[in-house]
């Protein structure tokens, strides 16, 4: 693949670091990859957008799923994952996940993560939506992500890995042959490095997390603006399955006008026996699915949305009053505190909940070793699309995917280094085409962020149709056209900065999401088309893949099968440009 030539308008790098590998992101995927690369003797640099312990991992409540319990097997975990994925999982990718997962969790424990234990002394395992067995290991009751983050951050600091915090990655650097040569980044604030710089490395691992901030209401932190997906698109990489955005069924409802990050009410609350009820106290999941409240997330989110439509309501309720105070305080202290902070006491009253954007099942298309279609560029965690999640991620498979595929990436880079194919001398990067005072590509103003979020929530949220998606595409195109006209006709664009770079990245990923959702004319997993209400395996048991063209149009195509072929050296299909 060749780069699009599109870059974020930014000053020229004023400093540079050399490394063997640069890992972008400090969640479970990024720090696991970094620790394994460092252990293999690779000079490793970690770049992260905020502090090392920020990002989505620390917000994960439920836990990490793996076949660790008595009587459970990887095959059973595989079956549950395939069912949740609604016919679009790559079975080989899932088999890797479930067979390598248990040992990956054990290595995480050896790194220093402390999981809750049962009274018998083994791991305390709970059950969540879509799982037929108790196989979710958790920590601190409902603070699993925070504990995993703590353990990994401590390990990174103990080993003295070089880290660059408060740094927004801008673009991929490549050499004349199109090989990865590092990244450009902007460090916020003053420190050892500040302003725009570069990390030169022959291998780049994207572990930048999700893009939930493309919607008005999300469980994702404010830093989740799709930076990794946007960078990969500009670098010429393929993105797959971006239409499959998982809306978590039970997010604390803070009012119809609430925007930004909102508190998650973990699946594990339902796993322990909480009931979904309407305003009349009627349970509405019984009879809709054999697992009732523990059905896969897409089914529960749709059921809540339908009930809201039927009742003209903007939320439903999660009733766990029967847990009692002691269970709430010991098993779900984080959720209890979040509810009480907003004036709700789940011990004595039902909790108002509604679906909100939670997880991108799609992302940068990779093979089984995390390799993208750009040589030397890897991706893992939520930013990646490995084929594991299909059309809908199974609860608590995300942390496991981050662990397993990060280790596979590190092994692949280490093997290339040992074989001498990871070129020892960092190639000289090509001159950045957008460093001049006269940028070629516009930046959106900061206020465009809210506009994009509202466009996406209205047109590409839980419920979608050809009309809603067409309106969203037109409005997104209008934002870009307005910025492009201001630049080309008047020589004006927004000043380079974190707010304008984030808004521009959000527009990039929003356009791709809408294009993919419009192309998939069926309902499957967490993609719900009102105008195509049925699942169509004959036509649509395949992936929607998108590339960014140099003229900023989108090349959209579908694969022939649900399986993921090798990404780096495969034959390229013919693409049909599509202006969005």
Curated annotation (Swiss-Prot):
Record-level GO cellular component terms: cytoplasm
Reactions that this protein is recorded to catalyse: L-aspartate + O2 = iminosuccinate + H2O2
Localization: Cytoplasm
Active-site residues per Swiss-Prot or TrEMBL entry: 297 (proton donor/acceptor)
Iron in keyword set: no
Gene Ontology MF annotations: L-aspartate oxidase activity; nucleotide binding; steroid dehydrogenase activity, acting on the CH-CH group of donors
Annotated site location: Important in orienting the L-aspartate substrate: 128
Cofactor(s) required for function per UniProt: FAD
Pfam families listed in its UniProt record: FAD_binding_2, Succ_DH_flav_C
Enzyme Commission number, as recorded: 1.4.3.16
GO biological-process terms attached to the record: 'de novo' NAD biosynthetic process from L-aspartate
Binding residues for FAD: 26-29, 49, 56-63, 227, 382, 398-399
Transmembrane segments: none
Family matches, as NCBIfam families: nadB, PRK07804.1
Function: Catalyzes the oxidation of L-aspartate to iminoaspartate, the first step in the de novo biosynthesis of NAD(+).
Name the record gives this protein: L-aspartate oxidase
Protein species of origin: Streptomyces coelicolor (strain ATCC BAA-471 / A3(2) / M145)
